[in-house]
A protein has these predicted regions:
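M16/insulysin-pitrilysin zinc metalloprotease superfamily fold
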Residues: 83-86, 117-148
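Active-site SXXK
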Residues: 70-84
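Bacterial N-terminal signal peptides
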Residues: 9-21
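Non-catalytic beta-strand/loop surface segments
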Residues: 23-62, 88-122, 158-212, 236-263
Length: 263
């Protein structure tokens, strides 16, 4: 490599690394604390734009479910948008949309999470809505009757009609014969067909407690601001006894397992 090429390469490298080093220098520390009711709060400051991301993570997911009751965590995620003490079905989403916010939720093997992205001065609205459904979810039977059909159609579209998704589902069932990782997050269709509001209510009351949740806020905020808002809204939610989650265990491998899929 000649001198000109080395100089050009060095300039290119410095151009790439300089923004990264500046970003590393600007990173703010992560703050963590708990409310008296056990809610864990994590705050990460990022003042580049007047925006915040607010997330509530519950320590429950499809791996917590038992045979015959699969899909409860995912179905409950859907029903969390169907009304609580302060708002009716879908009203929380309309409030957030009018504020220009984005929201969504997702369920996995070990957790269920809900989040909003919105202006920093609207964080209290997100907290109020999230705390309300943590404390007083309604679960109207008529809403469940409609929503379970949406979930079943979601399963048909994303799993039953998708060879790769179906193959992975069967692979997981074979790879984890003993633990909760055996079952798909959306649940088996036979369990969706017989799911009841009572089962969802039991799941909600068991796991959706402040002492089984983590509130994460990242954005243009300070820890003191978040702590004050969290105490104002989430601090009023009563702590509840939460079951001890079983550690996922698998039996010793009995030997070679073979899965054949014909498509």
């Amino acid at each position: 490599m000649n001198a000109l090429a080395r100089r050009a390469a060095g300039l290119l490298l410095s151009t790439v690394l300089l923004p990264l080093s500046a970003l590393a220098a600007d990173q703010q520390p992560t703050h963590e604390f708990r409310l008296d009711n056990g809610l864990k709060v994590i705050v990460r400051e990022d003042h580049r734009a007047p925006v915040v991301v607010s997330q509530v993570w519950y320590k429950v997911g499809s791996s917590y479910e038992t045979p015959g009751k699969t899909g409860l965590s995912h179905a409950l995620e859907h029903m969390m948008f169907k009304g609580s003490n302060k708002v009716g079905p879908g009203e929380a989403s309309l409030i957030l949309r009018d504020l220009g916010a984005q929201e969504n939720a997702f369920t996995s093997d070990d957790y269920t999470a809900y989040y909003q992205v919105l202006a920093r001065d609207r964080l209290g609205v997100a907290f109020e809505l999230e705390a309300d459904r943590m404390a007083s979810l309604r679960l109207p039977p008529e809403e469940f009757k409609r929503e379970i059909e949406v979930i079943k159609e979601e399963r048909r579209l994303r799993t039953d009609d998708q060879p790769m998704s179906k193959a992975f589902e069967l692979f997981s069932a074979m790879a984890y014969p003993s633990s909760g990782y055996h079952t798909p997050t959306i649940g088996w269709m036979v369990d969706l067909e017989r799911m009841s509001v009572g089962e969802l209510r039991a799941c909600y009351e068991e796991w959706y407690a402040p002492n089984n949740a983590t509130l994460v806020v990242v954005g243009d905020v300070t820890p003191d601001e978040v702590k004050a808002l969290a105490q104002r809204y989430f601090g009023q939610v009563a702590k509840r006894e939460v079951p001890v989650a079983k550690v996922p265990l698998e039996l010793p491998t009995p030997g070679e397992r073979l899965l054949k899929i014909h498509v």
